[in-house]
Amino acid sequence: ELNAKASFGTSLPYELFEFAKNTGNKSYDIGDIYAGAQSYAELAFGHSRQLNKNLRIGAKVKFLFGIARADFQFEDVKADLSSDDKWTLSGRAKAEMSMKGFTYLSEEKEYKEEGRGTYQRVNDIDVNGSGIGGFGMALDLGAIYKINDYWTISAALMDLGFISWSNTMTAVNRGESFEFSGFHDINVKEERGETIKGESHKYVDQLTDFVNLQDEGDKGSRTTGIGATMNFG
């Protein structure tokens, strides 16, 4: 039996919705935000057996051929709006992609603040060729028990397995926090000290490092689960 599988999952903490709905002068420990997707093909061999007149059990062994796996994590996200003189947003962002021929494409941009130079940011992707990006195995286990002519119960453990991927293309944010403390002691003219333009450029550059991802290349192989589930009926 040959099948193609694809799945998508996300994890959004309750605190994220609380922050979006009730933004106020307090601290929010939002936690971890996650989104991921995967696709693979499976070659399955199964067998079932009647143990007695009431109980039947079955198992399926599956050989997995990974096509692609993508994970995005925004870890330890915090928003501190409790202070009167500054607001802080922090978190570690990481994107991981396992797929044959996959690469991130980057562009070089200049920081707004004079003298800070340039930075690289991921702005596109490229897939040079295609094929199998990983291999793995999985098991399906199940049982059906007939209580009487009217009642039958069943249980199944599905997709208990893993895929070992040959590459992990990784990108992370350069800066793990953004702090806004307002505009203080600024002047319109440059010769009289800090200007509004200069102060705003500092915030823009800080936000740039926080939200943009930088390519870190191939971090090597990794092993991921395919999402085991338990069903009862």
Q: What do the PLM-derived regions correspond to, one by one?
A:
Residues 1-6:
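N-terminal accessory alpha/beta regions
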Residues 7, 11-233:
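Outer-membrane beta-barrel porins/channels
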